[in-house]
């Protein structure tokens, strides 16, 4: 009514100190969802260079299919595991306020992909497959097998802002164990240096760093009600002579680290 058209920046904002700052990669996605919530819109439409969310990266597998509808939980997993269609904070915000998101192409009139809170257990067992090749695996040998040792290893890592993903601790042998975890490759040398200092402190063994790994993940809410998905995945990899080095699972996700 005031004949005013607001123009709002999507990629920048103001922090707690009142300074202008950027929101990071995909920040405009989060801004769009926040505005949709504030304006009580029916849905938030995000236009991009792809026409929706696909079952996997179509640049890697040309037979990837576009997903018509997916729920917040699955989209959060896909975003956190490497799918670059939506910024993870935008999906978290949409889930918190139950704001549907529709991802559409700027170049076509296709309906795109709708992301909302509905769960349809009759849908496809697996919604998507993701892969990342920017991880590194670190192992510290002969760690004393005592209570609190995992926290002692990971606290200095997290205090430096290094995110730890998959963690494995071997069965104790001679009161020592091997402790293995993954981090982003760009942080691997810093993490290795921290582990070297820790190993000297509590008499641990050598530190091993492997940057030649990839992580492959299956995501699907249908896994909540279907058994045998992990076994099928592992059998398929074995048939291609691909050895699994680490495994991580949740109700709707299976991730494996391979060479």
Annotated model-derived regions:
Residues 1-259:
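C-terminal catalytic "cap/lid" subdomain
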């Amino acid at each position: 009514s005031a004949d005013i058209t607001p123009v709002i920046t999507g990629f920048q904002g103001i922090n707690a100190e009142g300074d202008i700052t950027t929101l990071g990669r995909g920040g405009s996605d989060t801004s769009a969802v926040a505005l949709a919530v504030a304006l009580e819109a029916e849905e938030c439409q995000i236009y991009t260079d792809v026409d929706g969310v696909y079952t996997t990266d179509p640049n890697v597998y040309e037979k990837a299919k576009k997903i018509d509808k997916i729920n917040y939980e699955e989209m959060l997993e896909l975003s956190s595991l490497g799918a670059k269609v939506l910024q993870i904070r935008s999906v978290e915000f949409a889930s918190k306020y139950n704001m549907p998101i529709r991802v559409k192409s700027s170049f076509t009139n296709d309906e795109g992909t709708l992301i909302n809170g509905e769960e349809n257990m009759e849908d496809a067992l697996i919604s998507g497959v993701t892969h990342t090749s920017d991880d590194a695996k670190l192992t510290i040998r002969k760690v004393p097998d005592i209570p609190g040792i995992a926290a002692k290893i990971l606290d200095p890592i997290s205090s430096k802002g290094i995110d730890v993903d998959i963690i494995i601790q071997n069965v104790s042998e001679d009161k020592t164990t091997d402790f293995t975890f993954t981090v982003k490759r760009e942080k691997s040398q810093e993490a290795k240096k921290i582990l070297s200092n820790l190993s000297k402190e509590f008499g641990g063994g050598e530190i091993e760093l492997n940057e030649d790994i990839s992580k492959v993940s299956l995501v699907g809410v249908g896994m909540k009600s279907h058994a045998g998905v992990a076994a099928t995945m592992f059998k398929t990899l074995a048939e291609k002579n691909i050895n699994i080095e680490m495994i991580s699972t949740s109700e709707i996700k299976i991730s494996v680290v391979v060479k």
